[in-house]
Design a protein with these regions (language model features):
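C-terminal segment of classical bacterial N-terminal signal peptides
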Residues: 16-27
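Immediate post-signal peptide segment of exported/extracytoplasmic ligand-binding proteins
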Residues: 29-50, 146-157, 322, 329-330, ...
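N-terminal (or domain-start) structured segment
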Residues: 31-110
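Hydrophobic/proline-rich hinge and linker segments of small-molecule sensing/allosteric domains
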Residues: 33, 126-148, 273
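Bilobed "Venus flytrap"/periplasmic-binding protein-like clamshell domains
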Residues: 45-79, 135-199, 203, 314-323
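An extracytoplasmic/periplasmic, membrane-proximal ligand-sensing/linker region
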Residues: 45-46, 195, 203, 213-225, ...
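Secondary-structure end/capping motifs
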Residues: 72, 178-184, 189, 198, ...
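Pocket-lining segment of extracytoplasmic ligand-binding domains
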Residues: 105-107, 113-119, 123, 141-145, ...
């Protein structure tokens, strides 16, 4: 019951996502220019491409499942296109070269407004599905390490930067901050992507890195050298700080790297599209994935948290695509609250 209340609190906290700043990320409260869909075609494309993080990550696992169901259940061919992270594929989505992408709720807002990790605004980004909730991330160390809590990271080597997946650094800095550790307290070892940084933990090149729970990359690294997630402080102060980012502390479910009761960070991981993708295309795909959720859930455990009640969020940070709205209205998932929220975030 307490976990359910906490998850409800996280949904509510998304509406205050944009207050304040953390780790050098500016406030994100500006309204968006929510223009109409520019692709008016009534014809479906022959294929759709989904931008994801590299193989072994949660985003890639989700994109692979969505692409497979698209290919099986429609006349379209679904393709997964992995990149170092959303920073690497966002321009392709903006230009209409990708139809969809997997991105977390904070990253989507930053991309739309050109703030935080983005030097340029990408105003055409639109939500298609609310996706996974909660998606969980934590700080991982070698199990044999004497690092037992976040404060023990002072003076240690941390994987850093992550190139095209810059949002990982934002989340990592947040987890360090709630444990009383600043970037200047650690030795920063830069990597071009998240996978390299996490593998470096097992290889002994760094002492800790951010990584998501329950993904293939964790299994791979744990096979190289047993790893362990650090327990994050489950305090009011920690949740207040994370609430600025639409996230909160949640209890980790039993999985590789969770050795005891462990608290990690949870937030929504969404499927987005753009105004360059036609209403018919987004409507068709959202309908297909909604109606074939049971099959999606056979592809990866993360789809167990890809629930219908999470697909039409009421506290979204970038607008929903008209094609998605059309479908959610048909199934009764879109309400007056959604219309009110759209007016709140759109100029």
């Amino acid at each position: 019951m307490m976990l359910k209340k906490n998850l409800v609190a996280l949904f509510l906290s998304i509406s205050v996502l944009v207050v304040g700043h953390l780790a050098g990320v500016p406030a994100l409260a500006a309204q968006l220019a929510c223009g109409p869909v520019t692709n008016k075609s009534d014809a479906l494309p022959r294929s759709i491409a989904i931008g994801t993080n590299p193989a072994g990550t949660g985003a890639h696992a989700l994109g692979s499942g969505l692409a497979a169901v698209a290919s099986k259940k429609t006349a379209l061919t679904g393709k997964v296109q992995p990149y170092n992270g959303p920073n690497a594929w966002m321009t392709l989505l903006e230009n209409g070269e990708l139809e969809f992408g997997i991105i977390n709720i904070l990253d989507a807002k930053m991309a739309a407004t050109g703030t935080g990790n983005y030097k340029k605004a990408h105003p055409s980004i639109r939500v298609a599905q609310g996706g996974v909730f909660p998606f969980t991330v934590g700080l991982v160390v070698r199990d044999e390490s004497n690092i037992k809590q976040v404060s023990d990271l002072k003076g240690k080597r941390m994987a850093w930067d992550f190139g095209g997946h810059a949002i990982s650094q934002t989340w990592q800095s947040a987890m360090m901050e709630i444990g009383g550790v600043k970037g200047s307290d650690v030795e920063q070892v830069r990597f071009s992507n998240l996978n390299e940084g996490v593998r470096a933990v097992a290889e002994g090149k760094v002492d800790a890195s951010i990584v998501a729970l329950g993904i293939g990359l964790v299994e791979e690294v744990n096979a190289m050298k047993p790893i362990r997630f650090l327990n994050l402080p489950n305090t009011e102060a920690a949740n207040k700080l994370l609430g600025q980012y639409g996230a909160m502390i949640v209890k980790a479910v039993p999985t590789t790297g969770v050795k005891a009761e462990t608290h990690v960070v949870g937030y929504p991981l969404q499927l987005v599209s753009s105004a360059k993708v036609s209403e018919k295309t987004v409507y068709t795909m959202v309908k297909t994935w909604w109606e074939n959720l049971a099959e999606l859930q056979t592809f990866h455990p993360l789809f167990k948290r890809w629930k219908k009640e999470h697909q039409a969020l009421t506290n979204f940070t970038v607008p929903y695509h008209p094609g998605a709205i059309k479908f959610y209205k048909e199934v009764g998932a879109w309400t007056a609250k959604h219309d009110t929220r759209t007016k709140e975030i759109c100029s």
